[in-house]
């Protein structure tokens, strides 16, 4: 075996190792070399072990002789091939590295590779397979002159050779051949592919033979491409496969990623996406804070052309650039998650028009910021009460500073990614089963359900402060009386607009201030409706409180019904008393009791109507758990009754079986009774016969029976009625 990983033929089944493997380049050099002695003929199976011969140099004449001998050689017996199953397999030779089968040129390794060095076998299985595999042999051109065999650990399965199939199947089922590399798990294949190509040299020994692996042709082709790609001495043979050999590892690595790797990679992407969102929010809020500081300081302390303003604007620009990079990285993680979740091969599949538009809009919103430098424009407005036009020179930074508050949408993203409902696996699984989309809207709904007051308070205060500062910035160039340009005055204007009061003592002058007030009024109307809903929910009775209230009302109505019924009976008795029992009828008292009687009847009817309404209201309060308990009680009672019925039916069946057995035994009892009576009668007749004989009376027998009585005269259970 040479350093390039090739075996050279030196005979039938012989492998010769030469570290240099010289190849004659011309006919003169081939004639100068002396031909080696002819190879020894193959020994029979029972021949003793022979020492290995000296290393031979491959010559053209010798190669022709070897080919003729190999064609004339009979097939080897299968008993020689089956003995390889008892040889141990070294686990480290499973790698597909080209150096895994290299061995130093020593006598021990040569003797081991020689087929006659093993007891009881004349042919190595690896040599036999390589000799019968046309895909592993290559004949060089006329200038090369030599036939070499590739030393690959993977051996092709030949369907046309029945001996190879029988030997391989025998070794496979007996444990002599390991499973192919293509059938390994994806994790082991990833580990094999991840290992470097440079493996330590493995020495061949009787206790450590090379492993033979049976695999498919596709795997052999891929691994042979990987084996021959690093060898510089075979670049002229594999020039066409160099480009394809670089693509095979990537394709195999992508295909061999199992579900465990994908889940781990997906979890890592989730964590990276959350950290990127946090960093983006930090830099976005930092830019807003620096923008507010720069705007306030440039209005009161220094001008826009100072170094302090330039430094703060440069800081804002730097934070904006970092923010844009974080947003790009965030959406990159989003695309990677889409590829993993949907099993896509190309990331461009995830880049839909909607996603591209969303990313572009987000980049545009986050890219707006004050540009370093001093830029001004003339701003014309009309004053509110005097309706006179006002023209002032304003900074362009106002137009670029106010849209920076749109970066606050990052807060909703961070809330979503940090929510327990979004990060918890159990909640995500339950939501997926119920077809719930975990987005920002769902998280806000849960927050409004859990703590509605806190959410509304934080939202209202934040909107109040931001809108007041925006109105102050918009109105300070045209407010000569310092009314709306004052921060406290702007807060008063926003508050009365938010609550939809509108006193009219303060009004904005510019369209910028009017637009902010319009948005504030819309937000105020929505927040007011939410506050009313939250207050109504807080004032509403709970289910337990409603049950208690209904119980108390039912008790009071029951008492009122009893009182009304008692009043009806009382007035009925009094009417009967004054009309029937008294001698002199007092019509005034009768009419009085009749009025009270009618009032009692109407009161009884009204109380019953209230009780009916209360019962209807109570029926609507029956929740699912109570209904479930009632149904459970009913089902339990039905089960108990069915069990009792089954017990009764079982007792009846046992009694019927007892009666049936009694009726079946009745004929036997009757037969036994009749038999006993017949025996008693016969015994009585025998006694009477004995007494008559003793007296000396001559008796003529009536029949052939010894007692003179025919047996047919006495019926038995087995005789018919006609014989009696």
From Swiss-Prot:
The protein's matches in InterPro entries, at most eight in alphabetical order, are given as: CaM-bd_dom, CaM-bd_dom_sf, K_chnl_Ca-activ_SK, K_chnl_dom
- Chain ranges passing through the membrane: 281-301, 308-328, 359-379, 398-418, 447-467, 516-536
Q: Where is the composition biased (Low complexity)?
A: 59-88, 131-140, 710-724
Gene Ontology terms, MF aspect: calmodulin binding; small conductance calcium-activated potassium channel activity
What is any one GO biological process for this UniProt entry? potassium ion transmembrane transport
Per UniProt, the keywords (alphabetical) are:
Calmodulin-binding, Cell membrane, Coiled coil, Cytoplasm, Ion channel, Ion transport, Membrane, Phosphoprotein, Transmembrane, Transmembrane helix, Transport
Q: Which Pfam families match?
A: CaMBD (PF02888), Ion_trans_2 (PF07885), SK_channel (PF03530)
Q: How does it sit in the membrane?
A: Multi-pass membrane protein
| Enzymatic reactions | K(+)(in) = K(+)(out)
Q: Which residues form a coiled coil?
A: 635-662
Q: Where is the composition biased (Polar residues)?
A: 105-125, 232-249
What is reported on the regulation of this protein's activity? Inhibited by bee venom neurotoxin apamin.
State where the protein is found.
Cell membrane; Cytoplasm, Myofibril, Sarcomere, Z line
Q: Which domain of life is it from?
A: Eukaryota
Family annotation (SUPFAM superfamilies): Small-conductance potassium channel (SSF81327), Voltage-gated potassium channels (SSF81324)
Pro residues: which segments have biased composition? 34-58
Q: Which GO terms describe its cellular component?
A: neuron projection; neuronal cell body; plasma membrane; Z disc
Q: Where are the stretches annotated Calmodulin-binding?
A: 554-630
What residue spans carry the region label Disordered?
1-161, 232-251, 702-724
The entry describes its oligomerization and partners as: Homodimer. Heteromultimer with KCNN2 or KCNN1; this modulates plasma membrane expression and consequently the small conductance calcium-activated potassium channel activity. The complex is composed of 4 channel subunits each of which binds to a calmodulin subunit which regulates the channel activity through calcium-binding. Interacts with CALM1.
Let me see what the UniProt entry remarks about domains. The coiled-coil domaim mediates heteromeic assembly.
What family does the entry list? Belongs to the potassium channel KCNN family. KCa2.3/KCNN3 subfamily.
**What is the protein's known function?**
Small conductance calcium-activated potassium channel that mediates the voltage-independent transmembrane transfer of potassium across the cell membrane through a constitutive interaction with calmodulin which binds the intracellular calcium allowing its opening. The current is characterized by a voltage-independent activation, an intracellular calcium concentration increase-dependent activation and a single-channel conductance of 10 picosiemens.
Please report the name of this protein according to its UniProt entry.
Answer: Small conductance calcium-activated potassium channel protein 3
Which gene produces this protein? Answer: KCNN3
């Amino acid at each position: 075996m040479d350093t390039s990983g090739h075996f050279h033929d030196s005979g039938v089944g012989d492998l010769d190792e030469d570290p240099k493997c010289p190849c004659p380049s011309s006919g003169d050099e081939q004639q100068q070399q002396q031909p080696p002695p002819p190879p020894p003929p193959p020994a029979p199976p029972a021949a003793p072990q022979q020492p290995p011969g000296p290393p031979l140099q491959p010559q053209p004449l010798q190669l022709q002789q070897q080919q003729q001998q190999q064609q004339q050689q009979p097939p080897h017996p299968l008993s020689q091939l089956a003995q390889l199953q008892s040889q141990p397999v070294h686990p480290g030779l499973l790698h597909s590295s080209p150096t895994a089968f290299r061995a130093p040129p020593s006598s021990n390794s040569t003797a081991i590779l020689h087929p006659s060095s093993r007891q009881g076998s004349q042919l190595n299985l690896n040599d036999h397979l390589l000799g019968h595999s046309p895909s592993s042999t290559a004949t060089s051109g006329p200038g090369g002159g030599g036939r070499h065999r590739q030393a690959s650990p993977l051996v092709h399965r030949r369907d046309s050779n029945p001996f190879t199939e029988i030997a391989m199947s025998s070794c496979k089922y007996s444990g002599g051949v390991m499973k192919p590399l293509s059938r390994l798990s994806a994790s082991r294949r990833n580990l094999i592919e991840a290992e470097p190509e440079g493996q330590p040299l493995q020495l061949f020994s009787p206790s450590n033979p090379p492993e033979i692996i049976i695999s498919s042709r596709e795997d052999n082709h891929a691994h042979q491409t990987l084996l021959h790609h690093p060898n510089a001495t075979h670049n002229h043979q594999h020039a066409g496969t160099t480009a394809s050999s670089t693509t095979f590892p990537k394709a195999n690595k992508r295909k061999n990623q199992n579900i465990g790797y994908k889940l781990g990679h997906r979890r890592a992407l989730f964590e990276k996406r959350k950290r990127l969102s946090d960093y983006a929010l930090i830099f976005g809020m930092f830019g807003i804070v620096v923008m507010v500081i720069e705007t306030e300081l440039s209005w009161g302390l220094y001008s826009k052309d100072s170094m302090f303003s330039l430094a703060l604007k440069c800081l804002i620009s730097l934070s904006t650039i970092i923010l844009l990079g974080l947003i790009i990285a965030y959406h990159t993680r989003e695309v990677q998650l889409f590829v993993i979740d949907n099993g896509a091969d190309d990331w461009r599949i995830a880049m839909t028009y909607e996603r591209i538009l969303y990313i572009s809009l987000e980049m545009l919103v986050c890219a707006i910021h004050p540009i370093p430098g001093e830029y001004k424009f003339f701003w014309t407005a009309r004053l509110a009460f005097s309706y006179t036009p006002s023209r002032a020179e304003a900074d362009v930074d106002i137009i670029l500073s106010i849209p920076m508050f749109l970066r606050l949408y990052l807060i909703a993203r961070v809330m979503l990614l940090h929510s327990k409902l979004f990060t918890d696996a159990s909640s995500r699984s339950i939501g997926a089963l119920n077809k719930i989309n975990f987005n920002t809207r769902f998280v806000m709904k849960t927050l409004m359900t859990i703590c509605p007051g806190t959410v509304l308070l934080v939202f209202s205060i934040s909107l109040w402060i931001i809108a007041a500062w925006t109105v102050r910035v918009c109105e300070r160039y045209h407010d000569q009386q310092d009314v709306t340009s004052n921060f406290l005055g702007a807060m008063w204007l926003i508050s009365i607009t938010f609550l939809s009061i509108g006193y009219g003592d303060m009004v904005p002058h510019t369209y910028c201030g009017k637009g902010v007030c319009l948005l504030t009024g819309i937000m105020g109307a929505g927040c007011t409706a939410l506050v009313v809903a939250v207050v109504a929910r807080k004032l509403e009775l709970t289910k337990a409180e409603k049950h208690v209230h209904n119980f108390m009302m039912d008790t009071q109505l029951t008492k009122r019904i009893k009182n009304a019924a008692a009043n009806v009976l009382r007035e009925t008795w009094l009417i009967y008393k004054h009309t029937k029992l008294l001698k002199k009828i007092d019509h005034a008292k009768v009419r009085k009791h009749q009025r009270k009687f009618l009032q009692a009847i109407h009161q009884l009817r009204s109380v019953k109507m209230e009780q009916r309404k209360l019962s209807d209201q109570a029926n609507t309060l029956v929740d699912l758990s109570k209904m479930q308990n009632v149904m459970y009680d009913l089902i339990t009672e039905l089960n108990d009754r069915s069990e009792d019925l089954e017990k009764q039916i079982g007792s009846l069946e046992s009694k019927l079986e007892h009666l049936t057995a009694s009726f079946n035994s009745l004929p036997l009892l009757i037969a036994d009774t009749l038999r006993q009576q017949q025996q008693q009668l016969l015994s009585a007749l025998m006694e009477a016969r004995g007494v008559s004989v003793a007296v000396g009376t001559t008796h003529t027998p009536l029949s052939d029976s010894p007692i003179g009585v025919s047996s047919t005269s006495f019926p038995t259970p087995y005789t018919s009625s006609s014989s009696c």
